[in-house]
Amino acid sequence: MASPVPSEPVSEDTHDSSSGSEVEQSEISTRAPKRRRLSESSDDSDDSYVAPAPLPTLSRIKKKGAPDAKPAAPAGQDNPVLIRDALEIGLREEASSFAALNVAPWLVGSLTTMAVRKPTAIQKACIPEILKGRDCIGGSRTGSGKTIAFSVPMLQKWAEDPFGIFGVVLTPTRELALQIFEQIKAISAPQSMKPVLITGGTDMRPQAIALAGRPHVVIATPGRLADHIKSSGEDTVCGLKRVRMVVLDEADRLLASGPGSMLPDVETCLSALPPSSERQTLLFTATVTPEVRALKNMPRSANKPPVFVTEISTENQGSIPPTLKQTYLKVPLTHREAFLHVLLSTEDNASRPAIIFCNHTKTADLLERMLRRLTHRVTSLHSLLPQSERNANLARFRASAARILVATDVASRGLDIPTVSLVINYDVPRNPDDYVHRVGRTARAGRSGEAITLVGQRDVQLVLAIEERVGRQMEEWSEEGVSIEGRLVRTGVLKEVGEAKREAMGEIDEGRDVLGRKRNKLKKVR
């Protein structure tokens, strides 16, 4: 039997119809009117009438406003990630959310206010397990959101019983501690939460008063917190005995042995806290070292669940973001400063925010003074500076008041400055893991970035070790129409840079700051 006429009018096809279509239209025109149905629910008194199966529309003209049909995704499967390499950089699929991880609504709202709407891979893996009370060792590349991975469950568990010092966060550098302090304050803004920052370079008396006031979370560097434990008295640090959660951020650096080790101070801090059987311990790092992995097998009390360990993109193939371009530039030892000046002045790099990493504080101090005389907008971050000046310089760089930050490895860990698109290794790092952390200051959270390493004749073995660590080879730096050697010869850059360097060294010998002001207590750099 022929198909009934649909209740909606059929658009007339302006093109030639097939023979099958003509037959179909002929049958429709000769059908008895009583056989027509205006809707599926219409009643028909003729029992012999049987509704046929619907046929596809005959017209090729679509109704206005009808959206194009899209193939449905298979049942139980999330929509595919649209960004190439999204999984590699730690971003999640569109269907994921913090609410699905059992995060409290007030925290979801706070994260949304901060434009953090979807959890990354490390956050999705760790947050549910931490909320269950498990100790955690989390490894994920730089810029993947490890701070939120431990801050959110800490704040959620604190909100259930907001009394006394609930958590302690230890981190190796003052700048990273300040950044974590500010992020925790922002996330906990809807609640009356009191964090406190305990770092070196500032007066201990206000810090002791703040500790005695029983803040809810303490963010500290190990050295300064250990000083308070040893010298500030029992009344000041007795609140630490009730801590329920401890976080070691950049755990590989905190637990490293050898010269400059922070391990003795970390042990002092942990000795003032409850035993491991009575608290939750979280370790996060971008480079999971054997010292960190060994903690998984340490003896545990019978009533504690096993340690949760996750390593997301921390092996050789994943330690460097896929959006990072790695290059090297061969430079002679005697003209390294001149090559750097020309490199910063090329058409592609002249306006890019950049961080220049040095191995020594004296090199960073000299480079800042020299580049300032060469008209670059530059500031610095290293241990020769007082803490107030370090904070001010970092704030200037974040606000784009300075385009270039010359720094030692104090700036290589944890600092999140989204505008940085270029990292220059003026000195090749001796440890390949330090290279991973340095170049991690750019190409964060899926953004693009470039890392350029200045390589001298004595640095070849160091570069090979770095390439083996990251699993990728560096390409030789090049820019269309740019020859650094040619510019050095033609433009007289060597003389200009030499004069700027001599003036900078003279300023250091006279004990003046970068603005030329006399400072009696300024350390001389020779």
UniProtKB/Swiss-Prot annotation:
**UniProt-annotated stretches for the region Disordered:** 1-77
Q: Which reaction does it catalyse?
A: ATP + H2O = ADP + phosphate + H(+)
Domain of life (superkingdom)? Eukaryota
Enzyme Commission designation: 3.6.4.13
Family matches, as Pfam families:
DEAD (PF00270), Helicase_C (PF00271)
Motif stretch (DEAD box): 249-252
Residue ranges, compositional bias (Polar residues) = 17-29
* The entry's keywords: ATP-binding, Helicase, Hydrolase, Nucleotide-binding, Nucleus, Ribosome biogenesis, RNA-binding, rRNA processing
Q: Which InterPro entries match?
A: DEAD/DEAH_box_helicase_dom (IPR011545), DEAD_box_RNA_helicase (IPR050079), Helicase_ATP-bd (IPR014001), Helicase_C-like (IPR001650), P-loop_NTPase (IPR027417), RNA-helicase_DEAD-box_CS (IPR000629), RNA_helicase_DEAD_Q_motif (IPR014014)
Q: Name one GO biological process term.
A: rRNA processing
Q: Which amino acids does the record list as binding ATP?
A: 140-147
The family assignment reads: Belongs to the DEAD box helicase family. DDX49/DBP8 subfamily.
The entry's protein name is ATP-dependent RNA helicase dbp8
